[in-house]
């Protein structure tokens, strides 16, 4: 409960104004006369936001921004008084993104998430329709627009084969960034593509931990598919997955899709889910129960984050598998 948070209590006692993030950011943009480039989507928004920040920095264009992951080329947030644009990872959780009317909106992908906020897929889609309608220029994949009952006015002419980034989802979202930035910079499409082909990535988004070991924050069906597609694209041998679900509530939502997500992997280890904001009335889906749900004919095993799992991972890596 935010009302009982000690920092809020202290601020109120000291007469210090406080607000939600979106209210604060709107006030900041208004006072500093900055235009927002908002990146929204069920999946891919962190990486896509970072791509836009990376490109503007490489072009030596002043930029202010806020992104939800650690960057190798800057802090998670930065304010430059000389910047014209504020690049923002616009999260749909708690309908946060509906507080903004961006100059440019980039939609990295629309699926379905956050059933605790959006009880139905229709309510989730309606939020994206509303966000798009209150944005000035929108760059999105036609299939995502069709999914929410909208249509694209123009189709990208940026050739996806020009990108050397790993992962088809990253190449598709790089297209959107190039299209968007080409409208507000003097750079050619060719130069923007070259810059994005050198994009170093962000933490926890198919981040290389060591040789043949990667970490990814994929926790919805499309995010998991995207991560596995990248893994299968770069793996020399087999792909092994250690799966830690995010929220027991979300596991109930994706449980029936688990078997379809695991096609082509050699071994699946399922560890206990990370718990937060849970519906206590729902059955706890333990690793054993999730292993039973995963019907795909893949070798699967319940596990915990211990030395035994570490030993198994080491054996897979030594065998040339990608984990």
Stretches with model-predicted labels:
Residues 151, 258-319:
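C-terminal helical cap/extension that packs against the catalytic core
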Residues 10, 16, 134-139, 228-235, ...:
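P-loop/Walker A phosphate-binding loop and immediately adjacent motor/lid segment at beta-alpha junctions
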Residues 15-17, 102-106, 147-166, 213, ...:
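Active-site regions of enzymes building and remodeling cell-envelope glycoconjugates
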Residues 138-143, 240-244, 264-275:
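Short internal beta-strands
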Residues 21, 104, 238-240, 267, ...:
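Structural motif
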Residues 163-267:
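Nucleotide phosphate-binding/pyrophosphate-handling subdomain across enzymes
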Residues 2-139, 146-152, 178, 182, ...:
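Phosphate-binding loop of NTP-binding sites
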């Amino acid at each position: 409960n935010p009302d009982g948070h000690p920092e809020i209590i202290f601020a109120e006692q000291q007469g210090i104004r406080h607000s939600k993030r979106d209210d604060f950011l709107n006030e900041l943009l208004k006072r500093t006369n900055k235009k927002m480039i908002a990146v929204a989507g069920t999946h891919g928004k962190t990486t896509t936001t970072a791509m836009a920040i990376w490109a503007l920095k490489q072009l030596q264009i002043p930029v202010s921004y806020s992104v939800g992951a650690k960057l190798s080329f800057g802090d998670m947030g930065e304010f430059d008084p000389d910047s014209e644009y504020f690049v923002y990872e616009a999260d749909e959780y708690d309908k946060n993104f509906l507080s903004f009317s961006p100059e440019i909106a980039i939609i990295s992908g629309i699926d379905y998430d956050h059933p605790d906020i959006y009880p139905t897929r229709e309510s989730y889609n309606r939020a994206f329709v509303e966000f798009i309608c209150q944005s000035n220029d929108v760059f999105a994949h036609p299939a995502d627009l069709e999914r929410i009952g909208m249509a694209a006015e123009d189709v990208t002419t940026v050739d996806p084969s020009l990108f050397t980034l790993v992962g088809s989802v990253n190449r598709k979202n790089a297209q959107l960034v190039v299209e968007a930035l080409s409208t507000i910079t003097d750079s050619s499409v060719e130069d923007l593509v070259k810059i994005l082909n050198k994009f170093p990535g962000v933490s926890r988004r198919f981040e290389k931990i060591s040789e043949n070991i990667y970490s990814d924050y994929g926790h919805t069906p499309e995010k998991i598919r995207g991560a596995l597609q990248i893994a299968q694209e770069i793996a020399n041998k087999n792909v092994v997955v250690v799966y830690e679900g995010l929220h027991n509530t979300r596991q109930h939502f994706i449980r029936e899709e688990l078997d379809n997500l695991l096609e082509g992997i050699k071994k699946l280890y399922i560890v206990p889910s990370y718990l937060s904001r849970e519906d206590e009335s729902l059955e706890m889906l333990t690793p054993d129960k999730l292993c039973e749900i995963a019907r795909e004919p893949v070798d699967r095993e319940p596990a915990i984050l211990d030395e035994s799992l570490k030993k198994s991972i080491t054996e897979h890596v030594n065998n040339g598998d990608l984990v």
